[in-house]
Amino acid sequence: MRLDKLLTELGTGSRSEVKKYIRSGLVTVNGEVVKKPEQKVDEKNDTVCFRGNQLTYTEYEYYLFHKPAGCVTATEDNLHRTVMDYLTDTARHDFFPVGRLDIDTEGLLLITNDGALAHDLLSPAKHVSKVYYAKIDGRVTEEDVNLFENGVDIGEEKPTKPALLEVLHSGDNSEIRLTITEGRFHQIGRAHV
């Protein structure tokens, strides 16, 4: 990998800033000052330092993030704060959230730069379960549980795949845990229990 590309990926600066740092002698590779941004380095075996601090390259990184209500599950948005706006400890720009939670929904999200893992987690063919906890208005009954076991009509051509609805508390305000293996647009909110 080119030295300037490596430093950019590690969040040292923009490509043009990194080139200036390298040409200024602020970067060493295996203890030697390097002034050519295009120099090839082995990111796994070479020791690269910037201003005397050793840099460590990891191809993939993973963050578990508790998304608060009020922010959107997106990499950028002109109207709302995004989950990416909370990642202050990284300057890498290749991260993305895996899956979606509605703006008013809070919950655990995986944020990564590992596209293959994201595909495996989101692909309907892989049948990876997603678990939701929800507080809802109204009483949840055994009939509702059976409805989810058979798939729910959410106003699309096909009903949802079967899901596991667990009633944690049933009353005027109920609490449920719902386990699904697909993720359709607003699926949880559109499944009127």
Residue ranges and their predicted role:
Residues 1-192:
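Basic, flexible Lys/Arg- and Gly-enriched helix-loop patches that mediate nucleic-acid binding at interfaces
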